[in-house]
A protein has these predicted regions:
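N-terminal low-complexity, Pro/Thr/Ser-rich intrinsically disordered segments
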Residues: 30-63
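Short, well-ordered beta-strand elements
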Residues: 134-136, 210-223
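A small/polar (G/S/T-enriched), proline-flanked helix-loop surface module common
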Residues: 64, 68-199, 203, 236
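Short, solvent-exposed coil/turn segments at beta-strand boundaries
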Residues: 57, 179-183, 209-217
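Bacterial signal peptide processing site
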Residues: 22-25
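C-terminal motif of bacterial Sec signal peptides marking the signal peptidase cleavage site
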Residues: 17-20
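Surface-exposed amphipathic alpha-helical segments
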Residues: 219-244
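Bacterial N-terminal signal peptides that target proteins for export
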Residues: 1-8
Length: 244
């Protein structure tokens, strides 16, 4: 496999999480939901490529990789490899099926970008000394980052792929994002895997899905990411969208 695929495949480890805490914005702040109300201003369509966070949001010790650029580079070096990634993504399944978006893999995001290059942009932030990875994706099409709003259906998840299967348990994570229309956040624990590449049993990663100001974005953090680094990235992406 092309070496350029490695940063994107970190998304697989970073995105082994399940969402909870979902809500819609009301006319007043609601601390229980993680959403606070703000005036709605029509700023026009969201351009994911200009609103996704850049290297200025990287935590100390982290470097950034553009998944969109990586996809272009690897196709130039190995024509057809991106279509192979799309095919691989189609082989990954989840049970329950609606929870697939809550345990995405690197090829999941590559597939979405290859097929919808203008509608989604993604970045990886990696700390090579700790193997910690934060992954961020922003889309102008909410269907590309569709996710279940009720974590109860995703309490137990099994993800199957050509190399075997991986099982997880999910728990709600409290997360507040000012101005968001919807926040879904959770911690997911790896309980069993047929592949050592999936991580260690008992390892906990985090994921959030946020709908705000006409955009939908997701942030995921591998088990090595500190909780405060994960939260700061979620807030940084919200701020970037609000200020566009």
């Amino acid at each position: 496999m092309n070496r350029h695929i490695v940063p994107a495949l970190a998304l697989a480890a970073a995105c082994t999480t399940v969402g909870a805490c979902s809500t819609n914005q009301d006319t007043e702040d609601n601390p229980a939901t993680g959403v606070s109300a703000s005036p709605t201003v029509d700023k026009g369509p969201v351009d994911p490529h200009t609103t996704v966070v850049d290297d200025t949001a990287a935590p100390q010790g982290y470097s950034m990789d553009s998944i969109n650029q990586m996809i272009q580079d690897q196709e130039a070096e190995n024509p057809g490899i991106n279509q192979d990634m799309v095919s691989m993504a189609q082989e990954v399944t989840a049970d329950p099926a609606e929870c697939a978006a809550l345990t995405p893999t690197g090829v999941t995001y590559i597939s979405k970008i290859v097929q919808n290059p203008d509608a989604i942009a993604a970045r990886d932030f990696t700390n090579e000394s700790t193997d910690a990875t934060l992954s961020v994706a922003v889309s102008s099409d909410p269907q590309l980052l569709n996710h279940p709003r009720d974590v109860s259906v995703c309490e137990s998840i099994t993800r199957a792929h050509a190399g075997g299967s991986t099982s997880y348990t999910a728990a709600p994570m409290e997360l507040r994002v000012d101005g968001a229309d919807s926040v879904t956040a959770a911690e997911v624990t790896l309980t069993q895997s047929s592949s050592p590449l999936s991580g260690d049993n008992g390892s906990v990663s985090r994921i959030a899905y946020v709908e705000i100001d006409g955009a939908t974005y997701t942030v995921s953090g591998s088990p090595e990411v500190a909780p405060e680094e994960f939260t700061r990235m979620v807030q940084a992406q919200a701020e970037k969208i609000r200020q566009r």
